Amino acid sequence: ITRRMVAEYMLDELQDWRLITSEISSVTDFRTQRRMRFGGYGVLPVVAQGDSYTPLTSPTDQEATFSVSKRGGLETITLEMLANDDVGALRRIPQRLGRAAGETLYRAVFDPLNDNAALTYDDDTTAIFTSGHANSRTLALNAANFDTVIQDMMAQTAYGNSREYLRLRPMFILHVRALWRTVDQLVTQEAQAEPFTTDRNINAFRKYGIRPIQVDYWTSTTKYILVANPRVIPTIEVGFFNGNEDPELFVADQENGGGSTQFNADQISYKIRFIFGVLAPIDHRSFAQGNT
């Protein structure tokens, strides 16, 4: 039963969150987890012949927080329900619970980006996408505007050091259903769908290998967000309790120690439990929103 549940939870379409996540961690308690972000030293000064080395300016730091929480619930079926189940729907309850767990985690990662949630740093609790972060636009998706948003990401500098450019490039584009065709034309087709330059309409974006990720449950018709390479800059952290990345399924019946409830009534109870937490994002510089 557990294997069937986990197989449904691991369906490919529910695993896109892993692509944009930079850290999957093991959390051993329910206390607040603290994550530090440090600035850089920038450009080192020249030391002339015979001169002493001067102290560098120490990088500043920020602290972000998150915690894991339990998610889950109970489902109970009776002997009569099971006997009358002509189409086997009740026997698929474990798979459906696995699907629910997968959907829960999927949305926990993508919801903060959709909702433009507030950051959790000690000195920055503004929204992810703001003019102050230089990562927020309201531009319809086309070649010229796509180029503008990419340049927004390229222009990001390190925390605490405006002279240190992070050299970010988009690796993914998150988008709503309504933009699937436009996104396909921009990032996968050899020729552009609209005039943009004088280079015989060749699609200059294609060489960057930007991968589209369609988020079907987002209700906007215009939203698209660029995501940098999670191996280059921290994006999102997902922490699992004791490193257990799979939901847990428990079955209570007479054979499995169901207790008086199962003894007094002919029924079987399922309990699903899933413990995790999400820090999204770790660094707002890793995301650039083109439209809401």
Features from the language model and the residues they span:
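Assembly/oligomerization interface modules of large self-assembling protein complexes
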Residues: 1-71
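Alpha-helical scaffold segments that mediate packing/assembly in large oligomeric complexes
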Residues: 73, 77-92, 96-157
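Noncatalytic linker/hinge segments flanking ATPase motor cores
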Residues: 31-37, 57, 113-120, 216-221, ...
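Residue-level signal for secondary-structure boundary elements
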Residues: 13-14, 102-105, 109, 121, ...
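Short gly/pro-enriched beta-turn/loop segments at secondary-structure junctions
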Residues: 166-170
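Short amphipathic alpha-helical segments
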Residues: 71-73, 171
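Short, charged/polar micro-motifs that form catalytic or ligand-binding hotspots
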Residues: 61, 65, 80-91, 163, ...
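Sequence/fold signature of self-assembling virion shell proteins
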Residues: 131-140, 144, 148-158, 171-172, ...
